[in-house]
Amino acid sequence: MEQTWDSYISSLNQNSLPRQVEVTQGRYSGSLENLSFSKGDIITVVDLEPVFVRAELKDGDQVLDVVTIPLRYEGNFQLMADPVSFETVADLTRSVRLPQSPVAPRSPPRFQNSIPISADNLPMKLRKGETLSLIGFQESRGRRLLQCKVLRKKPPLTVLLPMDCRGHFLECQDDRFYSIDTIVRWKMLAGRKRTVRVQARHHPKLLGPLVPEHFRGHLVLYPCFSVTANLLGETRVSIPSDLDISVTEIARLDRKPRTTMRQIYSMEESKFPVRVKIMNVVQSESKEYPKPLKRGQLLTILKTEEVKKFVASEISQGKKGKCFLVPYTYQGLVLRRGRYFYAVSDVAAAMKHGELCFQASQDYTSYLGSFASFRANECFLALKKSVVSAEIHGELHRVEVLKCLNIATKAHVKLPLFAVGKFLELFDGARPGTLQELCQVTRLPCHVRVTSPDPSMTVDPLYGTKELRIENVIIEQCLIAKDEPTLEDIISSADMYREWPETTFEIPIEKISCEVLVVEERSWIADVRKERCRPLQSIQEVTKESLAFSNCLVIRRPPPPVPKPRSLF
């Protein structure tokens, strides 16, 4: 079916890439963009990168304004549930972007089935109205299945739904708020319009000069993408999504279709090891992936593996610097340090699991008699969060406070959540240990200092940092690979096997968009003990953006505002 380029790109999400299309109506854009397409040209779409978002501001059915929202826009938005159901699981996965990792992010998409569901591989029939949390994909006996959690079951039941399963799935209302960057990358519905509301405390005038002061309507988002694509002759280009051409999708180009690392990961375990040739590759120019792949390179994919990693941020004077992915098996010794809290609201958020001691590093003066002031170096024991009534500017307001014990004076005080003190957590001394050992006795996030480097690494980038914040533990889906051996290696196969632990490396399938050609399924080495294939220890420096939109990085919320006189509103 012929479509405009813009319409076709809007129908895609990362789950379905790469895709190949044929140009049915060409376009010449001159020497500035250097993009010229003729009828019959073949384009392989390998990646979509959002650039900005156009949005219609609507009050009911009336369009008030059309604005452009940059990806770094600071305001947050709430999703409005899509009112139209998806008939089958295949329809659902074509529209909803899902993580390829089996570990669910903090806010996985949730849907309800409008009709009962029964399938051969389900342990029980799912009744109408079950809430399903969509986790990711799983391959079984050559079939791609959708992995879900049935939330009303205790404990939650994990089920695998085939693509042809009918459920008339309706999106559930999500009460969370997200940045525009997170929405465009993870929360859009391919082929459908995404409608959002502005966060109540956000000033709507920041969206545009024509937005009413008390705007309570909604926005319809139209993201614009930069499309990474391959042209004939392995030329790689970036194509804007609003290019004026028409295309039609094609199934495959030759008898030996190319596949992706993601599809290789989904193969049955019995088909490994497999030999592949890299046909083209897209990978970040940052330090996120330490071993670059090259076009024409031959690899032996030994197995798939779910690799646990710590997400760590370097801390300097209370501010975050570099971010790292640290192997779960990291053997450097660390010493726990107190966490940094900007405001009292951060202390309250951190004490969910018990009482907490903290020290102020700057003075705070309260102009309200019911709330306490404090000076730098004063120490407190946080007891519990509460709400009190206080007279502010002659008016009675309900204010959230943290009830604390002043450790020096033994006085019980109330600190408002909006008070800023740049606090440091206090706790009893602890012995050095590994990150794994630390996670067994404390909850993440926590702050540490590396006291001894990992002995297996030539250079440990964490050793020498003043302070690290261990944010989270993630699981990356990886292919364990080695460079294809030479003829001499194959002849002396025993030597090759002996070298595997030193030469294998990880290929994280979420970080590399790569087309490969399967050269040979190497069943003749299937009897080799795969447990010997261990990738080398490596610490990867990653960008904050790559962690933020994938829900791996814990982002501090600003403290609540100081109550203002109602006469100002």
From Swiss-Prot:
InterPro entries: CABIT_dom, THEMIS. It comes from the Eukaryota. Specifically expressed in the intestine. Pfam families: CABIT. Signal peptide: none annotated. Residues 255-523 are annotated as: CABIT 2. Residues 1-254 are annotated as: CABIT 1. Belongs to the themis family. This is Protein THEMIS3. It comes from Mus musculus. The lineage of its organism: Eukaryota, Metazoa, Chordata, Craniata, Vertebrata.
